[in-house]
């Protein structure tokens, strides 16, 4: 791939798709709209963190997972995002051990994730792409790779699950498997 490509037209199309997503979100019931927008807007930030799991109290103080179940259903059903739930026992029958209070939220399209992550830099989009192609932009590439894997798994008909193991000795998770 040549490093002098102009990605302005492609990025403009992707930004238009993101605007259409936002317009669609604005059409849903008011009781869900704020939560859906909050999650949608936070997807790039959530994925760029080491701990990618959604922490609901960080969205709104005192909130919890059950208050957002319709939100994730709407985003997933509209194919904007792919949800990934904790599985307490990585064994046969993953859905039996599904814990819906722990969720990761991936974008349904990794190319859109990149534009969504840099949506405040609309005037600099060609510069951003040039820096990416020349390996000069400091971004969390892991979030892109992880999102690609999530997108591929869903495209092949798989539900997304992750696993963590809490160590009582270390007082933290000592094992995490992103996809099982």
Predicted regions and their residues:
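A cross-kingdom feature that marks ATP-driven nucleic-acid transaction machinery
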Residues: 70-180
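Conserved helicase/translocase motor-coupling segment
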Residues: 1-77
